């Protein structure tokens, strides 16, 4: 079982992911851990844009948007993830995981959102920055995530139909959000039997 978590900037994606990983005793992969794994396996230099979140704006990005679902660029997320984590059960934060595993039955694709004010305050606390800096982080990060996701998937980032479950983590908190995801996984597993 894989659970992929995409999220708006300032949501508790890493924290929710860690709670889930601890509960089901599987590894948590995010940009940092995947980048470290790619370095160890010697593939980081082959996919610098995939680990960067800034491929858009290049000529290749424009071509990739119109190159069809089976383009080399659109296959990159799955190819990289297969090389790094294979069939391992895990929690995967970002990296277009929802797209990479969209055709798999044993995957739950989650998108976390939150009210802007809560996300700003979370970033202010987490990064010890002022309000205007947190707002700038949100704008810059979300712009990059949208471009990154479109570049690698041809899909709109955050569009509900691309996920199995969309949750406002502001309403439920970290533990409550993890509870909802776990209940969804449990219900899906029960239906498959």
Language-model features: locations:
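Glycine-rich phosphate-binding P-loop
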Residues: 4-18
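Short beta-strand-centered segment that lines the nucleotide-binding/catalytic pocket of NTP-utilizing
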Residues: 27-39
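ATP-dependent small-molecule kinase phosphotransfer cores
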Residues: 38-89, 129
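Small-molecule kinase domains that catalyze NTP-dependent phosphoryl transfer to phosphate-bearing small molecules
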Residues: 56-58, 130-175
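Short, amphipathic alpha-helical "lid/cap" segments that border enzyme active or binding sites
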Residues: 78, 174-182
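Short, polar loop motifs at secondary-structure junctions
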Residues: 94-98
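Short loop/helix-cap segments at secondary-structure boundaries that form the rim of catalytic
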Residues: 99-105, 160
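Conserved phosphate-donor/acceptor-positioning beta-strand/loop module used by diverse small-molecule
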Residues: 103-126, 131-141
């Amino acid at each position: 079982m894989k659970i992929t978590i995409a999220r708006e900037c300032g949501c508790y994606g890493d924290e929710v992911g860690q709670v889930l990983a601890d509960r089901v005793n599987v590894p948590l992969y995010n940009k940092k851990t995947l980048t470290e794994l790619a370095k160890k396996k010697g593939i980081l230099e082959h996919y610098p844009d995939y680990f960067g979140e800034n491929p858009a704006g290049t000529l290749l990005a424009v071509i990739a948007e119109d190159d069809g679902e089976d383009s080399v660029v659109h296959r990159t997320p799955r190819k990289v993830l297969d090389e790094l984590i294979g069939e391992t059960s895990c929690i995967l934060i970002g990296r277009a995981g929802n797209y990479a595993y969209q055709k798999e039955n044993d995957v739950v694709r989650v998108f976390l959102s939150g009210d802007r004010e809560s996300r700003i305050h979370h970033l202010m606390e987490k990064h010890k920055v002022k309000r205007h800096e947190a707002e700038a982080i949100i704008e810059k990060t979300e712009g990059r995530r949208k471009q990154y996701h479109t570049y690698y998937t041809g899909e709109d980032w955050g569009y509900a139909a691309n996920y199995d479950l969309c949750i406002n983590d502001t309403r439920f908190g970290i533990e409550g959000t993890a509870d909802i995801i776990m209940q969804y996984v449990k219900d899906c597993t029960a239906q498959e039997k």
